[in-house]
């Protein structure tokens, strides 16, 4: 797949996963991993609690942003053996900051609660069956699944662009 096909595929997969079973963090992360050929269910499992602003609270940032940031960190983050080396995390932090910037430019905020209020006029408590029904009626599955796809696409583009820079630096000069 070329870059554009990969970006479309990650959008399609992330959106489809979100529509099928939800959990914005896991859906964005899973789609990115699949398009890049990564199989790591432990990392996907670790994303579970980030859904809907952490624990369905709405009071944290969007789970799609969390899952996509986890994907960036998976490829560019520092390892446990480097925890004492502050500089080892800089690359992942700068890339995560770029994703956050793009996300806020696109959606005006990164807080799940605020995104829901902006898109649907209110926040939905997804632990409450009446709110769950109201969310479906308001179009939340379609709206959030599109957001999840867009966020996964943003993150994948950042990953691919950063990898291309790294590959260019390691190319041997033509003699």
Residue ranges of each PLM-predicted region?
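Catalytic phosphate/nucleotide-handling subdomain of diverse soluble enzymes
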Residues: 63, 67-76
């Amino acid at each position: 797949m070329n870059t554009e096909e990969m970006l479309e595929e990650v959008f399609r997969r992330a959106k489809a996963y979100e529509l099928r079973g939800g959990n914005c963090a896991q859906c964005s992360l899973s789609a990115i991993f699949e398009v890049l050929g990564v199989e790591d269910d432990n990392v996907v499992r670790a994303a579970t609690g980030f859904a809907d602003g952490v624990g369905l609270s709405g009071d944290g940032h969007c789970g799609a942003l969390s899952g996509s940031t986890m994907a960036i960190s998976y490829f560019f983050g520092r390892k446990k053996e480097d925890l004492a080396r502050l500089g080892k995390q800089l690359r992942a932090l700068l890339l995560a900051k770029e994703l956050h910037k793009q996300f806020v430019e696109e959606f005006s905020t990164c807080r799940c609660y605020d995104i829901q209020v902006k898109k649907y006029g209110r926040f939905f408590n997804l632990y409450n069956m009446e709110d769950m029904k109201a969310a479906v009626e308001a179009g939340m599955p379609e709206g959030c699944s599109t957001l999840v796809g867009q966020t996964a696409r943003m993150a994948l583009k950042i990953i691919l662009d950063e990898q291309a820079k790294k590959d260019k630096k390691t190319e041997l000069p033509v003699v």
